[in-house]
Amino acid sequence: MSRVSPLKINQLTNRCSTKDLSFRTTKDLKPVRDVIGQDRAVEALKFGVEIGSEGYNLFVLGPSGYGRHSVVQNYLNRLAKTKPVPSDWCYVNNFVDSYKPLLLKLPSGTGRKLAEDMDRLVEDFRNSVPAAFENDKYRMRRQEIEHEVSEQQDKALEAVKKRAKKKNITLIQTPSGIALSPTKAGEILDQDAFRKLPEKERKKLQKDITALQADIEKIIHHIPRIRRSIQRKVKDLNQAVTRAAVSGLIEDLKQEYSAMDNVQDYLDKVQEDVVESAEELFLSKEGPGQGGGNMPTEEMQVASMVRYRVNVLVDHGEAKGTPVLYEDNPCYNNLVGRVEHISHMGTLLTDFTLIKPGMLHLANGGYLVIDAMQLLMQPFAWDSLKRCLRSREIRVESLGQSLSLVSTVSLEPEPLPLDVKVVLVGDRMLYYMLHDLDPEFSDLFKVAVDFEDHMDRSSRNVQMYARLIATLIQKDDLMPFDRGAVARVIEFSSRHAEDAEKLTMEMRSVADLLRESNYWARQGKATLVKSDHVQNAIDQAARRLGRIQTRWREETVKGTFIIETEGERVGQINALSVIQLGGHAFGHPGRITAQVRMGGGEVIDIEREVNLGG
């Protein structure tokens, strides 16, 4: 069995020759626009984004520091500019059931315009309708209707009076109502005079009084029916006046939205509700005034008019393509939205204007990027996201409603149809854990975008890597690096990859080295970063983290750690342990010993002893 040949010192590091770099400084290099060394990941990203089938959401997996977020964001931002702008979404009042607001889907940019138009329309209502109620013609007609009650009552009583007069009976108006009293020769008889009348005449008068009282009671019982009829006529009059005042305003607005059937239908419902609620909105119920009713206060009127506002949930008026959003705090409410409340007189109140969107609403029709670990750390966020993706709709409800923990009455907004690509970003362990432990995960996130840890150190890739270094330098506005400095960074990259034939794709550590090299170059009053500055940055980083390494070496020199470097010992060898603490790795020699004894002359096969070999 031949022994392994020892390595020479120059074989321990794969040096990068400056002759292989065809530039003088990084200012001569064109920045990299596309991702390098991540062909597999980019292909998967392109596939997952473009396939439109259900369940093809993406999980971007790889270690942190490899540019996962930036690669995904840059790719999606470029793609989003070529895609159409999605629709606006608004919540409006449900005039049948105000606890269940309705959705309006509108072309992009129309939502805000409709909201502004409705605000102006409401202001026009507040000006034109009260003016119509102040019209003399309306006042006269209202007074005519209200006079019908007294006229009909007076007419009926007058007929009774005539019949009573023929029978020598008169009607007397008292505080408690109408009383009947017998008369003789035009004068009212008191009880003594009535008792002195002949018995036959008394009985006839009593009979006539009883009959007349029955007639009066019929009239009194009929008065509420007359008043209800009058109230209906007044209401019809108020509605007719309101309809005449608002119909022209609404028709003008309908002309602007003639191509949108849902807006036309909504405006028709607004008109019917304004007409139906005319007295509540424009006339108080305190009693008749100069125009038949007092105007409500401005505060009351504004509060009542809220029902005609438009709550613009999603506005894409200024968008240039599909939305690409990143949620750094993916809690339950931030994902699915919420219904806010206001405190009034010690009571919590809400309405459809207090419905607030979540990131799923804002990203609908586009892309939503979420950090997977942050998502899983938020209570109920993961389950709510899966529920929305599975049902393809967003329900705005509180956690209490979702978990059936509260019984208070709240809003139940109409669910919004969901069409979004969700991109989760996390490490490999998290991806494999979700894939194995969550049965719904593989149905909802069918595309894995796996980032490479390394790229081959070929001549072509070295040139591309140099351009990538130049891109990072330009991005952070650093001083230019010469060829020697770039070569030293490439050597650092191979060492970081722990393979002389590879280059690391963890660009965070490379970018840190570039910034620190730039710092040391500026400290030396240099105008160009050279290899010495890069080496100094590497050495200084190792020094900052090298306290434990220095202490261990001191203990070895003192003899606290006993290491023999000469001769041979049975059952004992020296080894090199690699210690990694806080991002700093260093080697430390150690002694490995084993118990030994004289054997019986037989060769022991370890694999056979543990039943792994024959």
Q: Which stretches of residues belong to each language-model region?
A:
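Non-catalytic accessory segments flanking P-loop/AAA+ NTPase cores
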Residues: 1-614
